[in-house]
Swiss-Prot record:
This is Envelope glycoprotein gp160. The gene is env. Residues 390-419 are annotated as: V4. Residues 369-379 are annotated as: CD4-binding loop. InterPro entries: Gp120_core_sf (IPR036377), Gp160 (IPR037527), GP41-like (IPR000328), HIV1_Gp120 (IPR000777). HAMAP family: HIV_ENV.
Length: 861
């Protein structure tokens, strides 16, 4: 019965135990689940994230492929060599916004081209001495009697004479030169006279600089490149209009080769559209905005200056040579350009169709320029070193009806554009700067490809209700070279790579024993931008490979830039490109060091995935873990937490500082753990070495003391008979001391030669300690005595100086008192005498009436 009762009681307890066990398991599972939901901030290095930015671009070019003797204006010899295998990484599932009208690359290119143009003219000759009166007549014939002048060229060339200073400054001689009519203006406004006074056209507003003889204006393709840490996004949509989102995006380090062709109305030798003609404008409804047309097929334009010129030198003083046209050999004919009429009409029809779609099926009319500067009214470009101004009215003289029919008149197979030539040009519409292009010998021929147009739309028609409301008139435009560069740079934008990313994970940083790690981090940013369209989880797998490309790419780019800078050392000054390259070098290193500095501050040096102890706050983003890592790209995630990035960075820094402080405190407590290392077997060899050194030192010390003892005994006239040292007999005058007295044993007493290693070590150590003690005691006594003597002498000197000071102080006091007394006595005596004199004078004055009365009395008596 007793057993059954106990069994029943234990069954009750067993039931409670099972319930307790299940409760504990459930509580543990709940704790694990709750712990699993806790997310922590993790730092990732090498994430495919970028932001729009503006930075200094540098150039790359194949300058060696062109004439090495002629110095081209664009200074492409100072550029970095182009990459023979340029990388272009397609960004899948990426949509990016572009805006060609607000692209800093256009402004940079415009400023660079102007600066290069100005810099190429700096060492050239200023033609200020030519700003004199020119006596000009129309060129009627040449030295060849069989030659003739074309009717259109009559009056186009002026034969002018003028006075210039020779090599001797006070001597003037008469020279002559041929000028184009566009380059001179009459002074007396008399155009009918056969011999009129003229002046150069820009003398009243600008400083004219002659282009150096070997300067070439041939456009060489320039590739604009971004420094390390930046990249170019390229839109590959074939019908991209320049603004808005682009879904076919790739990333490159450099642009394609852009020829810096300076022209108006027609865009020459540019890039073509891949699918049909493309028209682009910032605002089609605003007639002030220029319309940029990109063709899909080129139209050939062949130009010629048939005149065979000679060039002569005119000296304008010491060190100044002016190049002018000497004479024209053969017939004098007008320069002109030829364009295929069929190709041009086909191109205009395609452009009209695009414009008709944009402007609601209206009739499209192309008309000539409405007026303005010659650069705007005519098609202006450079052909073989001469600046052509061609009349383009024949190109823009057609009507395209809304039903698809058009009218352009009839004519020969080719359209011939008459061209005039100017030698004095005012480039870039800048005030105060003009350039004189020296004449080119012989005939000039050039062939170009028309790849685009610059158009302007007449305003006002769409707002009227008359019959012309359905007509849109377009005229050739240009003049702002930014539109020329924009027609090539429309597909690019500069972005700044942001390789640092933060995201929530379930991993928390643990404090472990830290070991040194040497991790090489590597270079080109384009490699890891390839994962931009992937989800965050897929992109994080390739972080190591992507980040390792960073540093080698920077180093390679730096080496290329240095080689380009070295190529300019023979010049006295860097070109614009040299300065850009130096800026790019500094910028690349600065970006890399900045990122590495942040990684170091966060305790993540050498890591690509770095956990932290900062808990993730759901207020930053309330998306779930799976939603973040499985559905979002890094770019989307960056936009999600962009407002909290700086806050997260600060929290990571504070957490790292606290962790380092905790580690320092922990290491201070763990110092005692190092005591157990003394008993490690790896330390035994070191202990044996120390023991051997101690024994060797003691043996050497024993030998030294023995030799010193023998020498001391020999000096006292005693020679030991054996190694057994006997105790000397003591006389009554040298008591050893008794037990009650407790006196010290005599130092001259010696002990027997002991046996055994330990006894020998003990005796030697005792002897060493006693020897050191006695010597140190003697030295201390000597020092004490010396200090005592010096103190006594010093005290006596101080007392003597004090007494001397007191004596002289008393003497000075007595002297001062004596001087004061003498001065007081002298002053008192002087004062008494003055008072006495005053008293006598006063009495004398008082006695004057008495004396007078006494005198009168005597006189009366």
């Amino acid at each position: 019965m007793r057993v059954k009762e106990i069994r029943k009681n234990y069954q009750h307890l067993w039931r409670w135990g099972i319930m307790l066990r299940w409760g504990t398991m459930l509580l543990g599972m709940l704790m694990i689940c709750s712990a699993a939901e806790q997310l922590w901030v993790t730092v990732y290095y090498g994430v495919p994230v970028w932001k729009e930015a503006t930075t200094t671009l540098f150039c790359a070019s194949d300058a060696k492929a062109y004439d090495t003797e002629a110095h081209n204006v664009w200074a492409t010899h100072a550029c970095v060599p182009t990459d023979p295998n340029p990388q272009e990484v397609v960004l899948v599932n990426v949509t990016e916004n572009f805006n060609m009208w607000k692209n800093n690359m256009v402004e940079q290119m415009h400023e660079n081209i102007i600066s290069l143009w100005d810099q190429s003219l700096k060492p050239c000759v200023k033609l200020t001495p030519l700003c004199v009166t020119l006596h000009c007549t129309d060129l009627r014939n040449t030295t060849n009697n069989n030659s003739s002048i074309e009717e259109k060229m009559k009056g186009e060339i002026k034969n002018c004479s003028f006075n210039v200073t020779t090599n001797i400054r006070d001597k003037v001689q008469k020279e002559y030169a041929l000028f184009y009519k566009l380059d001179v203006v009459p002074i007396d406004n008399d155009n009918n006279s056969t011999n009129t006074c003229y002046r150069l056209i820009s003398c009243d507003t600008s400083v004219i600089t002659q282009a150096c003889p070997k300067v070439s204006f041939e456009p060489i393709p320039i590739h604009y490149c971004t420094p390390a840490g930046f990249a170019l996004l390229k839109c590959n949509n074939k019908t991209f209009n320049g603004t808005g989102p682009c879904k076919n995006v790739s990333t490159v380090q450099c642009t394609h080769g852009i020829r810096p062709v300076v022209s108006t109305q027609l865009l020459l030798n540019g890039s073509l559209a891949e699918e049909g003609v493309v028209i682009r404008s910032e605002n089609f409804t605003d007639n002030v905005k220029t319309i940029i047309v990109q063709l899909n097929e080129t139209v050939k334009i062949n130009c010629i200056r048939p005149n065979n010129k000679t060039r002569k030198r005119v000296t304008m003083g010491p060190g100044r040579v002016y190049y002018t046209t000497g004479e024209i050999i053969g017939d004098i004919r007008q320069a002109h350009c030829n364009i295929s009429r069929a190709e041009w009409n086909k191109t205009l029809e395609q452009i009209a169709n695009k414009l008709r779609k944009q402007f609601e099926n209206k009739t499209i009319v192309f008309n000539q320029s409405s007026g303005g500067d010659p650069e705007i009214v005519m098609h202006n470009f450079n052909c073989g070193g001469e600046f052509f101004y061609c009349d383009s009215s024949q190109l823009f003289n057609s009507t395209h009806l809304s039903n698809g029919t058009w009218w352009n008149g009839t004519g020969p197979e080719n359209i011939t554009l008459p061209c005039r030539i100017k030698q004095i040009v005012n480039m870039w519409q800048e005030v105060g700067k003009a350039m004189y292009a020296p004449p080119i010998r012989g005939q000039i021929r050039c062939s170009s490809n028309i790849t685009g147009l610059l158009l302007t739309r007449d305003g006002g028609n769409t707002q009227n209700n008359n019959t012309n409301s359905s007509i849109e008139i377009f005229r050739p435009g240009g003049g702002d070279m930014r539109d020329n560069w924009r027609s090539e740079l429309y597909k690019y934008k500069v972005v700044k790579i942001e390789p640092l990313g933060v995201a929530p994970t379930r991993a928390k940083r643990r404090v472990v024993q830290r070991e040194k790690r040497a991790v090489g981090i590597g270079a080109v940013f384009l490699g890891f931008l390839g994962a931009a369209g992937s989800t965050m989880g897929a992109a994080a797998v390739t972080l190591t490979v992507q980040a390792r490309q960073l540093l080698p790419g920077i180093v390679q780019q730096q080496n290329n830039l240095l080689r380009a800078i070295d190529a300019q050392q023979h010049l006295l000054q860097l070109t614009v490109w040299g300065i850009k390259q130096l800026q790019a070098r500094v910028l690349a290193v600065e970006r890399y060091l900045k990122d590495q500095q942040l990684m170091g501050i966060w305790g993540c040096s050498g890591k690509f995935i770095c956990t932290t102890a900062v808990p993730w706050n759901t207020s930053w983003s309330n998306k779930s873990f799976n939603e973040i890592w499985d559905n979002m790209t890094w770019m989307e995630w960056e936009r999600e937490i962009n407002n909290y990035t700086n806050l997260i960075y600060n929290l990571i820094e504070e957490s790292q500082n606290q962790q380092e402080k905790n580690e320092q405190d922990l290491l201070a407590l763990d110092k005692w753990d190092s005591l157990w290392n003394w008993f490690s077997i790896t330390k035994w060899l070191w202990y044996i070495k120390i023991f051997i050194m101690i024994v060797g030192g003691l043996v050497g010390l024993r030998i030294v003391f023995t030799v010193l003892s023998i020498v001391n005994r020999v000096r006292q006239g005693y020679s030991p008979l054996s190694f057994q040292t006997r105790l000397p007999a003591r006389g009554p005058d040298r008591p050893e001391g008794i037990e009650e007295e407790g006196g010290e044993r005599d130092r001259d007493r010696s002990g027997p030669l002991v046996d055994g290693l330990l006894a020998l070590i003990w005796v030697d150590l005792r002897s060493l300690c006693l020897f050191s003690y006695h010597r140190l005691r003697d030295l201390l006594l000597i020092v004490t005595r010396t200090v005592e003597l010096l103190g006594r002498k010093g005290w006596e000197v101080l007392k003597y100086l004090w007494n001397l000071l007191q004596y002289w102080s008393q003497e000075l006091k007595n002297s001062a008192v004596s001087l004061l007394n003498a001065t007081a006595i002298a002053v008192a005596e002087g004062t008494d005498r003055v008072i006495e004199i005053l008293q006598r004078t006063y009495r004398a004055i008082l006695h004057i009436p008495v004396k007078i009365r006494q005198g009168l009395e005597r006189a009366l008596l």
